Structures are given as structure tokens and as C-alpha cells.
Amino acid sequence: MTTIKAPSRWSGTRNARPQQLAGHGSVSPTAPRAILVRMDINARNIATTAADAPTTQAAPAPVVGRFAPSPSGRMHLGNVFSCLCAWLSARSQGGSIVLRIEDLDDRCKRPELAAQLIDDLAWLGLEWDEGPYYQHDRLDLYENALHRLQDAGLTYPCFCTRAELHAASAPHASDGTPIYRGACRNLSAKEIARRSALRAPATRLRVPTVDDLADDVIEFVDRTYGAQCEALATECGDFLVRRSDGVFAYQLAVVVDDAAMGITEIVRGCDLLGSTPRQIYLQHLLGLPTPHYAHIPLLMSPDGRRLSKRDRDLDLGELRARFGTPEALLGWLAGQTDIAPDTTPRSAEQLVEHFSWDVIRAHRENITITAE
């Protein structure tokens, strides 16, 4: 069983800049079995061989967090809470923040929404140190990573329709994604050619088979929710790395970007907790470092709904008009979520001294919030 636990301090260096992913070497065809090996995630770097590795221990690298919003609509209060926690965590540790706009999906390719998002972050006083970087400018990096996986025989074309994947009888993973049962895993070359003539396939990544059930568990320690584990074969299945329309899957793109940008700490909503084992698996296959993960509770409306851009719940247009100043909004939000002892207006900088992961851990459950 592989144990991949996030350490409290990081000794990696930020060798790869956002324009270039370090280590374009090949992936071993036996890589799925390599996940059975206990790894020192502080030392992994596919650009450095063991013989060339330095003998002296590097000083701990500074914390590098990130904002990674999608411009699919105006930011809502839940997005603000996530960005605020990421910013406060990094700043409280003397770290920096990278801004990345995740706009691969067609519905996110709206420059006016990206510009509004950037303006909202600046208005809130959540300053970033690098970026913004746009995923639509980084397709060559994702293509390179996918080719490495394909060359190692770790992927295969999948022709399953959405209706087939979402069949009522199909089991689903913790994040609602159908657990793929491998219908296209072992198609012959002739059958692949026949189906390809009818429709474009998606691309799936192989995970260790159920025969390796005792050994395919991905384990990590989340800063909020503690020890987590997932058996890839039974709780996830082979997962997409590229959609049938050619768009790179979220799991692959964020893994490539987080490594290239030197991200050491990922703070995001607990709805993405279930994605983490897949991302750690990809990091291992590609020889990339594993960041420290911290998932936070979601903000919920009084009727039990998760706040969403689609429903325009407490979006920043409404919130900016209502509160007038970023200090008033952030102070109110910090008081509502117990980051601060009360709702006194405070700037993001003033909230740094109040921030503690102990408070976030104390919540664990999602937080019901209103604009009253």
C-alpha cells in the first residue's frame, strides 16, 4: 500500500516556471505498479537522477498557494471564502499566491468574465504575486503530459456515451462521477478503428486493476479533514484525461499547472476532496511533486443549497453594492465563518493575524450563511 502523506514542511524548489514543465522524460510502462512503492515526495523530481541528486538537504521552500477560479460567472460568496482562506493561509506562513484562470471549457472562454473576476479579487485586496496565467495558453503542456502517458501505454480511447456512463444502475464516486467499469479498456485495434469512424473517443487513464485492490490505495492527510484514502479500482475507476471534444480534463490540467507553477499548498472547497487521489496518482505517474492539500467547508444557503454561480447566490455584484467596502464584506464573512471573533470591518491584511486552521477544522461541516 502506498502511503502519500502531506508533510508539514516542504523542501522542493520552484525549478519549473509557468511556461515550462520540468522533466519531459518518458513514463515507465510499468508505472501503475510503481505506485506500490513507498515514496519520499519531498525528493521526487524527474529532472534529477538519483546519482545527480544533491547530498545536502535543501532549506524548506516558501509556501506557494494559488487562486484557480473559472470565469463561468460572477464570483459568489463561496468563491470569496475559498480565495480568502487560500490567501490567508499563504500570507500567514510568509508565502505567495499565484493566480491561474481555468478557462479550458467553452463556457469559461469569456474574457469579460475573466476581467471581472480579476477586478473582484483586486477590489477585495486579495493580491497575487504571479499571474494571471490562462489555461487556454498552456495547451502544449497538457498535450506533452498526455503524450507521455500514451507512450507508456497508460491510456486508451473510450467511446462510452454520457447516457451510458450515467446509467441509473452505475455506481458513483464520492464526487458524483460514475465509476467507470472498463467497457472500452481492452478493445482490439480493429474495434477501436471501427468505433473511431463513428465518433471521436475520449481518453482514459488506466488505474491499477481490482486484482491489486490491496495495493492500489492512495492515502493522504488533508489539513482539515485528516487522513483520507481511496482504492482507485473500486472507488474511482479509469478516469478521463481528455474529453471526446478534445478538451483536456480538469484532473490532468491542474496537475500539470500546479507542478509547473511550483504550487506547494492547495486550498479549495471540500467538493473537490474526491478529486485529490486521482491527482496524486497522476503526479506520481508524471514524476511531479505532491502539494499539501487543505479542503474547506462549503457555504450553504438557508434552504440547504450549495451557493452557486448558476443561481447567482450572493454574487459579488450584489455584495459589493450592499457592503460598499471590501473591509465591510470581508469582516462580515470572517465573523460568519469564525475566522474573526466578530463582524467588525477588517481588510484581508488585518485578518491574517486572526487566521487559524484550527478554526477551519472545527467547522468540518458545511456552513449555512445568509446575507442578513
Give the role of each language-model region:
Residues A163-S308, D315-R320, A371-E372:
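Active-site cores that bind ATP or allylic diphosphates and position pyrophosphate for catalysis
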Residues E127, T155-Y156, S174-D175, K190, ...:
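A general structural signal for well-ordered secondary-structure junctions
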Residues D137-A152, S174-G182, A202, R206-D212, ...:
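Short secondary-structure transition/capping segments
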Residues M1-R17, S26-S28, R33:
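Low-acidity, Ser/Thr- and Arg-rich intrinsically disordered low-complexity segments
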Residues D40-A173, C270-D271, S275-L288, R346:
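N-terminal Rossmann-like or analogous alpha/beta NTP/dinucleotide-binding catalytic cores
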Residues S26-G73, S92, I97, A193-R194, ...:
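Non-catalytic terminal extensions that flank enzyme cores
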Residues D105-A115, S301-R305, E353-R361:
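Short, mixed-charge aromatic SLiMs
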